[in-house]
């Protein structure tokens, strides 16, 4: 049969720019990144800069973070055991790192 995740309903929670990407692997993986790619949201409760930190990974590589101004509800949902995932929604070859990668956060029902 088809994998279980294929049958799941996904509800859009928010769309965000990728924060902090200039410090991570985005430049290295840029040629491989595509709109629609799945992103893993990793809770970093022990992050000393932001206790609501949610890291964004692509194929096991950290790309950046959910922006601090937009991460509180996402952190709470992950802490509560909700299934959230990210998807690349837009890629722009822009010198401003905040404009290069946009992604959607989806609640898996």
Q: How would you label these PLM feature ranges?
A:
Residues 1-109:
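Conserved active-site motif detector
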């Amino acid at each position: 049969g088809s994998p279980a995740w294929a049958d799941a309903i996904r509800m859009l929670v928010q769309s965000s720019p990728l924060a902090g990407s200039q410090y991570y692997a985005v430049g290295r993986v840029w040629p491989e990144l595509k709109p629609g790619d799945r992103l893993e949201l990793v809770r970093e409760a022990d992050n000393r800069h932001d206790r609501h930190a949610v890291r964004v990974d692509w194929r096991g590589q950290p790309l950046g973070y959910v922006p601090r101004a937009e991460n509180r509800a996402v952190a709470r949902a992950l802490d509560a055991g909700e299934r959230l995932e990210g998807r690349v929604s837009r890629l722009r070859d822009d010198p401003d790192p905040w404009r290069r990668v946009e992604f959607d956060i989806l609640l898996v029902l």
